[in-house]
Amino acid sequence: EYQEQYSKIPYTGLQLLDLETTMMLKPDLLVGWHSTFMPKVLRSTDFWHKRGVNTFIARSSMIDAKPRTLANEYKDILDLGKIFDKNERAQQLVGQMQQEVNFAISHTAGYQKRPRALVLEFMGKEPTVYGEKSLAGNIVKELHGELLAEKQRAIGLEQVVELDPDVIFLVVTEFNYGHEQDVLDRVNKHKALKNLRCVKEGRVVALPLYAIYSSGVRTYDGIK
């Protein structure tokens, strides 16, 4: 849908540009995460304001921005719509997301049992849990799913087996984009997990980080 406009953007890589290159581009506005404006990255917002460059930090990227919610993503989109004088388009994007949420709710209203979901990322010795304060967790709850291990930060494989989730979402970070199957195989082919019902039924799903962390317009992909 946006291929033509996207092709006109000077830089679209996953790696953040360095300070010198960013300044050479002479931006009017920098839109980023809280981490974008750290001293060792692109300097502080004050640094840019003194040079006449405006800044916008995504709400959910703030260190204390918990819980991270769909409502915050909607607000960011609407605020950017005001900045770029694209209010109607911003409202349309938010409306599409809300429509998807309402669609899921209406089609699961008759379920006697809510789908039980576990959202994990493999890092360190134990999988990290995306719990009740994460955007991914909020999406699961907004869609009337039951979020498992919602108060935990990590989880052992034995507990995963005990929970027997209806679906496991595996978060794929930028380092593994294009290698989603390798991430899925960490569950599907793991000797301790391969007999889970959700594995046998093909309900282990790759979830790109860009769709569930400070995701803005890409939140639609996370909801879908």
Outline where the language-model segments fall.
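Short beta-strand->loop
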Residues: 54, 186-203
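Short, Asp-centered acidic motifs that coordinate Mg2+ and/or phosphate
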Residues: 28-29, 166-169
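Alpha-helical scaffolding within the catalytic cores
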Residues: 40, 99, 106, 154-159, ...
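A short, structured surface patch at a secondary-structure boundary
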Residues: 1-25, 29-37, 148
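Extracytoplasmic substrate-binding proteins
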Residues: 29, 43-123, 150, 202-224
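Alpha-helical, coiled-coil/dimerization segments enriched in small aliphatic residues
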Residues: 8, 129-156
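A ligand-binding cleft/hinge motif common to bilobed small-molecule-binding domains
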Residues: 36-50, 171-187
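Short, structured coil segments at secondary-structure junctions
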Residues: 7, 50-52, 143, 200
